[in-house]
Regions:
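C-terminal transmembrane helix and the adjacent membrane-cytosol boundary/short C-terminal tail
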Residues: 7, 69, 76-92, 158, ...
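Transmembrane alpha-helices
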Residues: 72-75, 79, 83, 97-130
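Interhelical loop and adjacent transmembrane-helix boundary motif
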Residues: 133-173, 177
């Protein structure tokens, strides 16, 4: 699947940009976007009661924006590997573009989409910079595991830091195992 050429490079760059920006820079832009003092943030809060800055939702938004490029790149690569003749066959059989996408392209791309999802989750798990900028570090409300580790290390509480580090190591190992399974499954199918 290819976007019209004037827009594909722009959209690709926009969706990949958070991968190359320092997380604090991405967090700064997210803070500007979602602040109640700015148009979009004010609109969300006034009309829907949605507060992103210094909230759990801010943690989710920051982690999603920072990790999205990994998902996007994997999905895009998986979509490009779908044999074009299968898409043409679907068109010949009268399938709509929507049906072709959901019944041919997505199922054949599933391993790549899954591995992108796993990598995105792993990246989101370790997110610190953008989350700190957008959601803050409010204990019990917006503090992530990475922020918690940094906080207890400032207090030289090595036992608590060690506990959280072990949690992250176990989660990361599990995520990498899932990723490995997905990539091996994809190679096995070819």
């Amino acid at each position: 699947m290819k976007l019209p050429s004037p827009w594909d490079n722009f959209l690709d760059g926009l969706l990949t940009l958070p991968m190359v920006l320092p997380p604090t820079v991405a967090g700064f832009f997210l803070l500007l976007l979602f602040s109640k003092r700015r148009a979009f943030g004010s609109f969300l809060f006034t009309h829907f009661g949605i507060k992103v800055v210094q909230s759990f939702l801010g943690c989710v938004v920051a982690a999603t924006v920072i990790s999205l490029p990994l998902m996007y790149r994997n999905a895009r690569s998986a979509f490009s590997l779908v044999p074009k003749d299968l898409v043409y066959t679907g068109r010949t059989l009268g399938m709509s573009e929507f049906s072709i996408f959901w019944k041919i392209i997505v199922p054949l791309s599933a391993p790549g989409i899954f591995s992108g999802t796993v990598l995105s989750f792993a990246r989101a798990l370790g997110e610190y910079g953008a989350t700190s900028m957008l959601a803050g570090n409010i204990p019990g409300k917006t503090a992530t595991i990475s922020q918690r580790i940094a906080l207890v290390m400032q207090d030289q509480d090595y036992a608590t830091a060690g506990f959280w580090v072990m949690i992250v190591l176990l989660l990361s190992f599990g995520i990498l195992t899932l990723y490995q399974f997905a990539t091996e499954e994809k190679q096995f199918r070819r």
